[in-house]
C-alpha cells in the first residue's frame, strides 16, 4: 500500500467519523424527537450510575466473603491469603466508592434536568398542538368599559382552546438515529434543542373587524361577536352594526437552536460558575458537560481478578508484603519484590485455575452449616457473608478458629452441594444414600469435618516442634 492509498483511507475514515458525530443531536427537529433525545441521554447517565453502583455492591460482597473465608481456610497461609484479598478489596472499594459518590451527583443532576426538560416539551406539545378554539360569549357593555375613550367594545372573557391527548412518537428514522450508543462523549459534543419560546409562549393569530358604527346597545352575541340594529344578525354580519374578533390559531411553532457541550481550553464548561439566569439549552449544556467532567469510573469487577494481576498490582503487593510474610517480617514492596512474588505464588498459585477455584469459586461451590443453640444456619460463603446472619457466621467461625490456634475448628462442617438432595428423604432412603446421613432427626448431607487437633501437634503452622497441652494452657493463664 503506497502513501497515496494510506492518505485516502485516513481521509475516508475521518469523513465517516465526522459524519456519525452528533447525528443524534442533529436528528432533533421537532418536539417528539427532542423528547426522545432527552430521555435517551437521561437514561445514559442513569445507567452509568447504576452500573457503577451495582459493580461496587458486588465488589463489597466479595470483600465480605473473603473476610469470612479467612476463618474457613484450614491452611494458615491460605487463610492469610483470603485476608489479604479482603484487605485489597477494601482498598479498591473505598477508593471507587469515593469516585462513585462524587461523580454520581453530577450525572444524576444532568439526568434530572433532562427528564424535566422532556416533561416540559411534552406538556408544550399538548398545548401547542392542533385543537378546537372557542371564543365564548362576548359582552359589549364590559367591552366599552374596559378600553378608555372607546365608543364601543366587544369583550371576550373566555377564549379557549381544547386539544385532545396526543401521543408523541418520533418517526422511526429519528428513533433509530437517536440511540443510547450515540450518547457517548466521543459521539456527542453539541446540543440541538427546541427553542425556549416553544415551552414558554403561546402565540395567538387573530383579526379584529367592525361594521357600521358599533355602540353599547348592539347586544346580539349569537355568532361570537356583537351585532344589532336593522337587518338580520348572521355569521356574515347581516346586521347593520357589528364588532368582533376572529382567532385563527393558538400555538407556537417549534424551531431548534444549537450550543456546544465541550469545555473551554481552561477545562471550564459552558457557563460554569455563572449565577445569571440561563436559557434551557444553556442550562442543560452546562449540566451535561459537568457530568462528563466528573469522570465516573465503573469499578473493576473483583470477580474477574486474575492470579497474574496479583503479581503486578501495586496496591495488592503492598498488602501482600505485610499479610503474607512469615514470622511477622515486613517486606519492602520494591526491594523484596521477588520474595513477595514467591509468597503470592505459594499462597495463590501455581496458576490461574487454582487461584480461581480456591478464592473465587470457593465462595459459592459449597454450603456450610452451623448451629447457634437450636437454630441451624447454612449457606455458601457468599450467602453467609452477605446475608442477615453475616455477623453470626463471622463470630462463630472466627471464635472456632481462635479456639484451635489458627486451625479450622474440628466441628466446623463443610457441606457440599448435596445438601438439597438429602432434604426431605425418609429415614430408610437417607440411610441407603451414599451422600446422606441422619442427623438431628433429619436427613442431611454427610459432613466433612476437619481433624481434631492433636494435643502434641503444632497448630501455628510456622514450626515443626510439638507443643504440650500443659505448656499451652500455662501460656493462656499467663496472658
Curated annotation (Swiss-Prot):
Proregion positions: 463-479
Glycosylation site residues: 120, 458
Intracellular or extracellular location(s): Cell membrane
Organism: Trypanosoma brucei brucei
Keywords: Cell membrane, Glycoprotein, GPI-anchor, Lipoprotein, Membrane, Signal, Trypanosomiasis
Domain of life: Eukaryota
Lineage: Eukaryota, Discoba, Euglenozoa, Kinetoplastea, Metakinetoplastina
Keyword Ion transport: no
InterPro entries, sorted: VSG_C_dom_sf
Lipid-bearing positions (GPI-anchor amidated asparagine): 462
Protein name: Variant surface glycoprotein ILTAT 1.22
Membrane topology: Lipid-anchor; GPI-anchor
